[in-house]
Regions:
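Non-ligating segments of multi-cofactor redox enzymes
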Residues: 1-266, 271-274, 281-313
Length: 313
């Protein structure tokens, strides 16, 4: 008796569509997890440098390693670093920051303009570890959103934070930021950091997937604008893509994976991409890879001049 074979689903390039399969070997798992582990090392490393300097007096060449907080800090006692969004709020209150703070904001702004503004979100911000955990639990438990909210809402929150800074005379977002609260709790043992973290975790877990980082956080919105023309991008290799959709399942900002736009640009061009690298490690076809914008060439558009001339001849 002849058995009827199931037809193999193919992508637009004619290749069979393959699902991502987690390798069984430890080495294979580490290849999938290597960017995640590197991100965690950076996030925890930054917190450890703050903590070690405050609690244990860490020094390098007689200078404190990293003092201050995630809004304004000093590296090795002489390199100022400042959150440009926090500085912008301070300026809007009518105060003029110190020259060192302005320089620190310029350094950070330049760094994220090169690497991608939302690299901050995926590689430095401690809240990312909390929201990643809630996203993982949602996938495991099959939890659905309670309601929908436009991802552009964060830009509205961004504008409101700036307006409130003008009207109240204080840096509005810095007072309620769960990022600042968590940092103060971890490093100095004061504030409502764990309460803020719990609120973000429960909101993301039960109410809205990536609710805080992907829909509400004005700092993420600010850095998305900064990163629009970043040099570091994720290259998109159109001929190898089978449209399997595995990347969109794990991406915290799936709207950036517009395959038509990516094919036209040869890369994920949206400033909302966090450059977390999840799509890179999950792609069965190695379609997505980090690259520099200058080395990414958009696919050549077909020359329709001759065909148009034939039609009008």
């Amino acid at each position: 008796m002849n058995q009827v074979s199931t037809p193999v689903k193919t992508g637009p390039n004619g290749r069979p569509v393959r699902a991502f399969v987690m390798p069984e070997s430890l080495g294979g798992k580490l290849r999938v997890w290597h960017l995640l582990l590197l991100r965690r090392a950076v996030q925890l490393g930054v917190l450890l440098l703050f903590f070690g300097t405050v609690r244990w007096g860490w020094e390098a060449a007689g200078r404190p390693v990293l003092t201050g907080n995630l809004s304004s800090s000093e590296l090795f006692g002489f390199v100022p670093l400042a959150d440009p969004f926090a500085v912008l709020q301070i300026v809007l209150t009518g105060q003029f920051p110190l020259q060192e703070v302005i320089l620190g904001a310029a350094i950070i702004l330049t760094l994220y303009a090169l690497l991608g503004g939302r690299v901050w979100c995926a590689w430095v911000c401690p809240i990312n570890m909390v929201t990643d955990l809630s996203a993982w639990l949602r996938r495991r438990l099959g939890i659905s959103d309670l309601f929908r909210l436009s991802r552009n809402t964060r830009y509205t929150v961004l504008v409101l934070a700036l307006l409130l800074s003008v009207l109240t005379g204080v840096a509005a977002f810095e007072w309620i930021s769960p990022i600042s609260m968590l940092h103060r709790e971890l490093i100095f043992g004061i504030g409502l950091g764990w309460t803020a973290v719990l609120g973000v975790f429960l909101f993301d877990l039960f109410i809205l997937r990536n609710g805080w980082c992907g829909h509400l956080c004005p700092l993420g919105a600010f850095y998305a604008l900064v990163g629009k023309l970043a040099l570091l991008r994720i290259r998109f290799d159109t001929p190898t893509c089978t449209h399997c959709g595995e990347c969109a399942k794990v991406c915290p900002e799936p709207q950036v994976l517009n395959l038509k736009a990516a094919a036209a640009a040869g890369m994920i061009a949206s400033g909302e991409c966090t450059n977390c690298g999840r799509c890179i490690t999950i792609c069965p076809e190695d379609t997505l890879q980090f690259n520099l914008r200058r080395f990414i060439e958009a696919p050549l558009k077909p020359d329709t001049t001759q065909s148009n001339q034939r039609r009008t001849a």
